[in-house]
């Protein structure tokens, strides 16, 4: 396994962005890659986080046009308060209970984000 602290988490999102599959490759992640050559654009990323070590990634993904979601145990008042604070501060797009069934807020939010990503992609690739 690989230990993942907040610094490693940010490195992993850049690896995903650039299409680097090795968890141990720390050289290529710092190489410049043209936007049109990136495997997963930030604008097509959705980052879920549930703690303080996720805040840097949530902020970065959102800053580069992606979507960040703070999830929390609805029975834990402190976690809920923390997630709602991230939303108020503009660090995440959504703060929602960590429930993922088809009737949940998380399911609805993710479906809406996927539909938005697809619509943005379709608009960018129109040839009129």
Where are these regions (language model features)?
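C-terminal cap/substrate-recognition subdomain and adjoining C-terminal extension
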Residues: 1-128
């Amino acid at each position: 396994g690989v230990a993942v602290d907040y610094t490693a988490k940010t490195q992993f999102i850049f690896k995903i962005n650039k299409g680097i599959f090795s968890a141990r490759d720390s050289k290529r992640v710092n190489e410049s890659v043209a936007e049109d050559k990136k495997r997963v654009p930030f604008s097509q990323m959705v980052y879920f986080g549930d703690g303080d070590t996720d805040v840097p990634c949530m902020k970065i993904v959102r800053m580069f046009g992606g979507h960040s979601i703070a999830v929390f145990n609805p029975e834990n008042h402190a976690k809920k308060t923390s997630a709602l604070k991230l939303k108020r501060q503009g660090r995440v797009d959504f703060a929602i209970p960590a429930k993922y069934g088809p009737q949940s807020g998380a399911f609805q939010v993710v479906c809406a984000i996927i539909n938005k990503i697809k619509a943005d992609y379709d608009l960018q690739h129109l040839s009129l």
